[in-house]
Structures are given as C-alpha cells and as structure tokens.
Amino acid sequence: MCNESIEVIPRLRYLLTFTESKEYCCTECKSHFKKLSKVRCPNCYKEIQGNECVDCQIWKKKGYTPNHIAIFRYEGFMKEYFSQYKFMGDYYLRKIFQEDIADALNPLLKKGYTLVPVPLSEERFAERGFNQVEGLLEGLPYQNIFGKKDIEKQSSKTRKERLNQENPFFIKQNVELSRKIVIVDDIYTTGSTIYKMVQLLQKPDVEEVVTFSLAR
C-alpha cells in the first residue's frame, strides 16, 4: 500500500511444501492491520465487554441469531485499504489478505461448506469493474447463487436505514443450493446485508448458514 519494495522471508510451510512464498504487502503496512480480540460478541465478533452486542439483540428479536466470523478490525488502516481497493479500484490489493482468508475458510471448506460471495448489482459492477468480495476469494472455490437489484449505496445510509431496508437480493434461477453455506462479505457493520441473504436461504434443503467477513 505504501509502494515500497517487499523483502520476502520464506515461511516454514513454504519450505516444507516447496511452494513459492507470496507477499503482497510490506511488513510495516501489514503491522497496521489489527486483528479482532477474543473479547467480543459471541455471535458477530464485535469487540465489546460483556455478552451480546446491541445489533445482535435486535436481530434476535426478529428471530435471527448471527453466526459470524471475522478477522480484522474495520478501523484506521483497514478503512484506507478499502478506500484504495474498493473505491479507487486498486485490484492488486485483493491479494494482501489471501492467506488470512484461506486460513479462516479452508476448515469450513473441508467440512463441506460452500462459499457464496455477496453480489454486486449489474450497475455497481459496471461502475467498479469487479466484485471486491470475489477478488478476496481468489484461489478458493465459490458459487454465485445470488443476484442483486440496484439500490442506494449502503455507505450512504444511516444505521437505522440499513436495518430496515427492503431486501435487494434474490436467488438466481436454476441454482442448486448446498446444504451448508458460508456467505462471504468484505465488511460487517450492522449485519443487515448478510441478514437479508440469510432470509432467502430459509429453505428445507439448507441445513446451516455461517457468515464471514474480512473486517468487522
């Protein structure tokens, strides 16, 4: 992110498997990304003292308990990362967290879960040129089962508006749903985006839905 050259130090896993070590971010920049602590909401990984966060309490009143996993805090350097990657279109930055994401999701893949990225509307995809979530999942198998209607950007909405927004997502025609699904997003804020997708998966064939985001 700082445009400095990267010194690659081989890691044990690459030495043992004779594979190439890939580093896409310098050590200095990577040190600014902070992982979520163990003191957090058990449902959505929000860092709080005590038990459930307010958002999860709201979801429970609607009959939904989040089952979410996240890795990093959405603050400071991570916000700058998404500004460059998502909004300024620096597609190369999708590679920075590939190893972190693979480490988090591979155990679920081994248990038979199918990764499902949050989609963009056709209008947003044409504007951005890529789906940032699919970029983060590069190298991992995933299935596109959802489509999305064009609506106002989430970032322009208030917290209350996000929670009460009508469902813009739909399941594509002739899609075979897996029994166990992981919905993957880039950032988790109130959980409204993921909740609307989970609603659509309330079907007999779907046994379990887990959700994941890079940042929380």
Mark where each language-model region is.
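Glycine-rich phosphate/pyrophosphate-handling loop used in enzymes and phosphotransfer proteins
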Residues: M1-R216
